[in-house]
Design a protein with these regions (language model features):
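Negatively charged, low-complexity tracts enriched in Asp/Glu with abundant Ser/Thr
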Residues: 1-17
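Short, surface-exposed, charge-dense and proline/glycine-enriched linear segments
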Residues: 4, 35-40, 64-69
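A general, composition-driven signal for non-globular sequence regions
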Residues: 5-9, 28, 61
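Surface-exposed loop/turn and secondary-structure junction residues enriched for glycine/proline
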Residues: 10, 32-35, 57
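A short, structured beta-strand/loop element
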Residues: 16-48
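Mixed-charge, Lys/Arg-enriched low-complexity segments
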Residues: 44-73
Length: 73
């Protein structure tokens, strides 16, 4: 399931700093931003209104990878 996730580092116009956008397929489900002193995660709803169901270890791996890329590690 990890290979269906995509992480994009971007510079949206509404942010001062870079963000890590996290997608499952073509649908964004989370974003990590660094606008404050600590990293902050925003979770987005599915377009169809259903709940996201993603295995816990996968979520952790994807978030850690996104954090690593965002920090340039």
């Amino acid at each position: 399931m990890l290979d269906k996730h995509r992480i994009c580092i971007s510079s949206p116009p509404d942010r001062e700093k870079l963000v890590a956008e996290i997608f499952f397929g073509d649908t964004q489900w989370a974003e990590i931003n660094q606008e404050r002193d600590t990293l902050e995660v925003e979770f987005y709803p599915r377009p169809d209104g259903r709940l996201w169901r993603i295995d816990y270890p996968v979520v952790l791996r994807v978030l850690e990878e996104a954090k690593r890329r965002l920090r340039g590690e």
